A protein has these predicted regions:
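Conserved N-terminal glycine-rich FAD pyrophosphate-binding loop of Rossmann-like flavoproteins
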Residues: 1-15, 141-150
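Conserved FAD-binding subdomain of flavin-dependent enzymes
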Residues: 5-33
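FAD-site-proximal beta/loop scaffold in flavoenzymes
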Residues: 73, 78, 83-100, 188, ...
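Glycine-rich Rossmann-fold phosphate-binding loop(s) that bind the pyrophosphate
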Residues: 110-112
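N-terminal Rossmann-fold NAD(P) dinucleotide-binding loop
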Residues: 115-116
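Generic hydrophobic/aromatic pocket-lining and core-packing "Φ" positions
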Residues: 119-120
């Protein structure tokens, strides 16, 4: 479910929201193709885009302008039953799902700023938040660590990793292993938030678009412009701070306006 998108007071299923987006775009004449882009050439004009065989001599499409909105994937633990339990106790977004765990005991996996930020936010709702970290100290900034250590609702399980999910239709707990002594125990929780990072889908743009060290596309301040004139980026592929559906939609609007204005400039006169 998507519970924090404006206009849907009772929430809306993600696929339904996407279907609505698609129908609205098509009503205004957009052509949507479900295909995988395997190669791009942004060093030529018009830009070249390959779908299917990337070794083909001829590109599938050419374009005067391109908007990149390939998103980012949350890193997961890749344990059995994980996919089935996402949305049924397992989440990667505290701001999306935290409210549903009011007065419950939950856990966060990770040790960086993102994990601590998630835990701090979740402590507003949950009765207890356990940060599970495979090392004996956090990687988060000192100010974030100090805030977490001072929060009475946040506890820490050091030198542990999650090895198994307990529950079939909903999460009922996790099995954790001490990475030092190899001993195992069970943590009875109703929610697990995985905060071990995200991977932006930018591999086909490497060597062409300027990327941050973490792989996200660099854009100009207050703009969707990239380092290549005529190429714009929006959504989670360039935003590693907010990562919300509403901010992605807003930046998509920015990119559309930026691209439209750029095209008008190219054809002016």
């Amino acid at each position: 479910d998507v519970e924090n998108y404006p206009g849907f007071p009772s929430g809306i299923m993600g696929p339904e929201l996407m279907s609505n987006f698609r129908a609205q775009a098509e009503r205004f004449g957009a052509e949507l193709l479900t295909k995988k882009v395997t190669r791009v050439n942004l060093h030529t004009s018009p830009f070249e885009v390959w779908v299917g065989d990337p070794s083909s001599n001829e590109p599938t499409f050419t374009a005067e302008s391109i908007i990149v909105s390939t998103g980012a994937k949350a890193l997961m633990l890749n344990l059995p039953k994980e996919i089935e339990l996402v949305g049924h106790g397992i989440s990667t977004c505290a701001t999306c799902d935290g409210f549903f765990f009011k007065d419950q005991e939950i856990a966060v996996v990770g040790g960086g700023d993102s994990a601590v930020e998630e835990a701090m936010f979740l402590s507003r709702f949950a009765s207890k938040v356990t940060i599970i970290h495979r090392r004996d100290q956090l990687r988060a900034s000192k100010i974030m660590q100090d805030r977490a250590f001072a929060n009475p609702k946040i506890k820490f399980l050091w030198n542990h990793q999650v090895t198994e999910y307990i529950g079939d239709t909903k999460l009922e707990g996790v099995k954790v292993q001490n990475v030092t002594h190899q001993t195992e125990s069970v943590l009875n929780i109703s929610g697990l938030f995985i905060a071990i990072g995200h991977t932006p889908n930018t591999s086909i743009f490497e060597g062409q678009l300027s990327l941050h060290e973490n792989g996200y596309i660099k854009t100009e301040s207050d703009s969707s412009r990239t380092n290549i004139d005529g190429v714009f980026a929006c959504g989670d592929v360039q935003d590693f701070t907010y990562r919300q559906a509403i901010t992605a939609a807003g930046s998509g609007c920015m990119a559309a306006i930026d691209a439209e204005r750029w095209l008008e400039e190219q054809h002016a006169g």
